[in-house]
Amino acid sequence: MRHYEIIFLVHPDQSEQVGGMVERYTKLIEEDGGKIHRLEDWGRRQLAYAINNVHKAHYVMLNVECTGKALAELEDNFRYNDAVIRNLVIRREEAVTGQSEMLKAEENRSERRERRDRPEHEGADSADSDDSDNSDNADE
């Protein structure tokens, strides 16, 4: 069996069906003896260019190990499912199980947002507690 990285884009009006689609595709791979190494739902994102007058899509990435038969069936499912507006299958030399760069960047962004928002609230609290500590020391 070979390793593949699969990314497919779902029409934004069909975003609520993504869970069912992923379940169906993973079941197809696993029933044929394949294995899902990584599954990431990147959510709805802006497209670089419009596809069929659609400017956003729901992105899903899978790293799988499967047979050629299962891959062909999966590609047929993509082709005949109107909700899938684009797909990309890349053959990999080995299984990729780590977090993708896309998710790492998203986590970094959210961490920076948290840090940016946190000092305003914590800074005021720590300043108050420092003042009270200093006043206690002054009495001694």
From Swiss-Prot:
The alphabetical list of record keywords is: Ribonucleoprotein, Ribosomal protein, RNA-binding, rRNA-binding
Q: In what ranges is there compositional bias, type Acidic residues?
A: 125-140
Give the residue ranges for region: Disordered: 96-140
Entries under InterPro entries matching the protein = Ribosomal_bS6 (IPR000529), Ribosomal_bS6_CS (IPR020815), Ribosomal_bS6_sf (IPR035980), Ribosomal_S6_plastid/chlpt (IPR020814), Transl_elong_EF1B/ribsomal_bS6 (IPR014717)
Query: Any idea which GO molecular function terms this record carries?
Result: small ribosomal subunit rRNA binding; structural constituent of ribosome
Composition bias type Basic and acidic residues, residue spans: 103-124
One biological-process term from Gene Ontology?
translation
Question: PANTHER family attached here?
Answer: MITOCHONDRIAL 28S RIBOSOMAL PROTEIN S6, SMALL RIBOSOMAL SUBUNIT PROTEIN BS6M
Q: Which HAMAP family match?
A: Ribosomal_bS6
Function field:
Binds together with bS18 to 16S ribosomal RNA.
What does the similarity note say?
Belongs to the bacterial ribosomal protein bS6 family.
Task: Name it.
Answer: Small ribosomal subunit protein bS6
Name the source organism: Pseudomonas fluorescens (strain SBW25)
